[in-house]
Amino acid sequence: MVDVVMAPCSPVECRTAVVIDVLRATSTIVTALSNGASGVIPVKTIEEALEKKKEGVLICGERNAQKPKGFNLGNSPLEYRKEKISGKTIVLTTTNGTQVIEKIRSEEIIAASFLNLSAVVEYLKSKEDILLVCAGTNGRFSLEDFLLAGAIVKRLKRNDLGDGAHAAERYFESVENTREEIKKHSSHAKRLISLGFENDIEFCTTEDLFKTVPALVNGVFILKEFP
């Protein structure tokens, strides 16, 4: 079965979990690894992140969309350029994305974004029990995450869909332009734009910029190798 859940309050279980935080955690994870970071370690708190600071490690993330004091990078994927992060380990803490990972009980967890949409779909074609876990925004529904979930469901072309997957697919089918839909109607996107992050919206809604699939292995996101 394929299903979709939004901002779960309690632990969720499945065999293959796909974590989605379009704006911006999973887009940043995909970008960082695609640009040469050796791994991305998601953590819940700022304090936990700062405790991991050492040579070769970059402390990154945001609270309320802004880079915390003492951090090397924020949560804008545009900051994660090859010359800054190649060969480095990224420790990442964010308001939504890294928090929801803690609630997933799964044999495997991968990170999805519009940036690696086709690669994620290709990887999932061989999987049976799939749960698309949308991070949401501050525990609430997030339009952009649901839209990406619908895009994944649509491309998988499966018949065994849960109610959440059906709804996400229907929503995706009703949208003519995903970028414009997000910019016009996503409250989180509007807030980021008001804070000066409009370029992030443009970047995070770009499809298939990367052909990579980050997977969480022993607490670290690394690039998943598959045929």
UniProtKB/Swiss-Prot annotation:
Superkingdom, taxonomy of origin:
Bacteria
What Pfam families does UniProt report for this protein, alphabetically?
2-ph_phosp
Q: Which residues form the signal peptide?
A: none
Which cofactor is recorded for it? Answer: Mg(2+)
Q: Which reaction does it catalyse?
A: (2R)-O-phospho-3-sulfolactate + H2O = (2R)-3-sulfolactate + phosphate
Q: Which GO terms describe its molecular function?
A: 2-phosphosulfolactate phosphatase activity; magnesium ion binding; sulfopyruvate decarboxylase activity
Q: What is its EC number?
A: 3.1.3.71
Task: List the keywords (alphabetical).
Answer: Hydrolase, Magnesium
InterPro entries of this UniProt entry?
ComB-like, ComB-like_sf
Q: Which family does it belong to?
A: Belongs to the ComB family.
Protein name as catalogued: Probable 2-phosphosulfolactate phosphatase
- Its encoding gene is what? comB
